[in-house]
Swiss-Prot record:
Keywords, sorted A to Z: Cell outer membrane, Membrane, Signal
Function: Together with LptE, is involved in the assembly of lipopolysaccharide (LPS) at the surface of the outer membrane.
Compartments, record wording: Cell outer membrane
A cellular-component GO term for this protein: transporter complex
Record's subunit section: Component of the lipopolysaccharide transport and assembly complex. Interacts with LptE and LptA.
InterPro entries: LipoPS_assembly_LptD, LptD, LptD_C, OstA-like_N
Signal peptide range in chain numbering: 1-23
Protein name: LPS-assembly protein LptD
The encoding gene: lptD
Gene3D superfamilies (alphabetical): Lipopolysaccharide (LPS) transport protein A like domain (2.60.450.10)
Covalent S-S links between cysteines: none
GO biological process: Gram-negative-bacterium-type cell outer membrane assembly; lipopolysaccharide transport
Amino acid sequence: MNKKHTLISLAILTALYSQQSLADLHEQCLMGVPKFSGEVVTGDVNALPVYIEADNAEINQPNDATYQGNVDLKQGNRHLLAQSVQVKQSGNQSTPLRMAYVRNGFDYKDNQINMLGKDAEFNLDSHDGNLTNSEYEFVGRQGRGKADNITLHNNYRVMKNATFTSCLHGDNAWAVDASEIRQYVKEEYAEMWHARFKIHGVPVFYTPYLQLPIGDRRRSGLLIPSAGTSSQDGLWYAQPIYWNIAPNYDLTFTPKYMSRRGWQANGEFRYLTSIGEGKVAGEYLGKVRYSEYASDNRKRHLFYWNHNSSFLQNWRLNINYTRVSDKRYFNDFDSIYGRSTDGYANQYARIAYYQPNYNFSLSAHQFQIFDDIVNIGPYRAVPQLDFNYHKYDLANGWLNFKLHSQAVRFDNDSKLMPTAWRFHAEPSLNSLMSNKYGSLNIETKLYATRYEQKKGSGKNAEDVQKTVNRVIPQFKVDLQSVLARDITFLKEYTQTFEPHVQYLYRPYRNQSNIGSTLNNDYLGFGYDSALVQQDYYSLFRDRRYSGLDRISSANQVTLGGTTRFYDIAGEERFNLSAGQIYYLSNSRIDENPANKTPTSSSAWALESNWKISNKWYWRGSYQFDTHTNSTSLANTSLEYNPEKNNLIQLNYRYANQEYIDQNLGKSANAYQQDIQQVGLVVGWEIANNWAVVGRYYQDLALQKPVEQYLGVQYNSCCWAASVGVKRNVTNHQNQTRNEIVYDNSIGITLELRGLGSNDHQSGIQEMLEKGKLPYIRAFSLD
């Protein structure tokens, strides 16, 4: 599992882009920002006439005019208030030069900036100007400051001996003082020379050059650095460098130095074109100073590519590829492209063509497994060709026809494992009859599969049957109904009862000759089959196994039903679903007794959701084995959620060891015993500035805490800070069965607010998603 280290983000060079905004604080911050009154005039404002009002005016046509007392000057979006304004005109009549001189104080406003100052000069034709001893504030966004001198041009402003901050009036939490600031209006960024970063007036950082965003446009330059310390990395520092190549291309390069490991290079390239979008990323460490690989001087790296595109109207291309240099890469390095707890890296590519009645695709799929003790990983499917066709409303609307067909080749990194081609065709006919009371669906299907298998090339590879043909018919009848009634003991409520009955028949075929007899949690059965995790909804699935290599026999009846309660407004407030499979004969895939259903019925499965009120929610699921009179699985959550970002959740999870081993594999249960956990999650905004998240999970079987987390974040209009302390169960290489290992970490982040497109997030959602057991909201019936 990835170690979480102490992290101090130095919010000095730029601002982070937030994904989730805190509406209340954001609105309050905007209330402190000046807004432009009136309609914005577009076009060439310089060509518009100038209107002047004043208490007194002395006009000497055509050369000059002097206005005294409550002078009000307007030109398009520009508005100037002053006590004394002198307007002079020179040049010829065709190209006049009009200048305005303001003395003894002024108040200037337009749709981009407001300014107060002592003296000013304005070119009324070009909009150039020069202001002294001025204060300025952006319109419609955060940003203000002072300057000894401001020179105005059409597209930029030059400020001498100036300051800048995104804090509102009355808040001087941080500011940047610079000998010169240039603000580019259209490009929406500011350059600063000899910049001193101050916190409450105290200088804490100096840089000869600095860039800050003052708008929504992305800018090339240095992004926010991060630094910290950890037991494995030592002291480390990472400096992202952003390159805005084009509006639809950008690159972030992040060199990272670790005192115990050396230099690591990280890069991420994003693209958006007319035929698709995607992201390509890489991480590379040339020489490992500290790790289990240090002795052989192994180079460690990661490659990631995600792509989605549509082209030529009917074509789709999807790629999701992650590869790392070794199995323990994500244990040693913190990466946003994967986690060791995932167990594997996905490597998938697919190109498909779609038409209304059919589609086909060509794909390749494989996994890179992280488990150290697994020496035989899952098969790769390269290539795989799928074709699907459907034709509805046959026989005057009584029949629907579907066809799924596939050709795929399987091979494995282990030479002990056989390789194979699988050819599969799956036609089906169904007749669906429905009305307001329910529906009846009768379906017949045929699974026709051919395998051409080849023995592995390893010395002890097992023999396999070269050719296997398997044909399995299937018949299914599915009946659903909806019955409704008013409830006498609950006035203004309506109850529905939705019985669901399904009969499924498939004859038995011995499939032990498909694939290898070897089996582990990653191999499954055959080439791509594994038991499907059981719940209420799985009771009505056609097959117990995923993939096509194990299609179990079936002669079973599934009985289930759902009841729902609706209030007078038609809103669903409560539901309860329960069901069970009754096996008329054992479901089998081969002659191995371990692979057949050992009892005459499945476990009872229940699912329920209850919207107690608009603030309280409850959800529960339960599976009970009637043959052992024991609980297989139980989950329940009770949540109080009065408003966005405020919640308290109490939850309980239980799964017995047999259920875990059967559905998730023995590798998912490191301690080889029942899992029984109780948890408490709290997330709360205190006023509009403070947010607190707490999370505690206790394993009742181990009698140990599984995860503990406390996070506190302070938010203001111009800065935010958060502290998170966490302790959770983790693992390490060569861990013994009964050994419990904890990972302790503390993280601190600082962030500037009000710059660029930076929103004002509370931090609650981000803190809730952190951790080994992230928060999952109790199901809402909204």
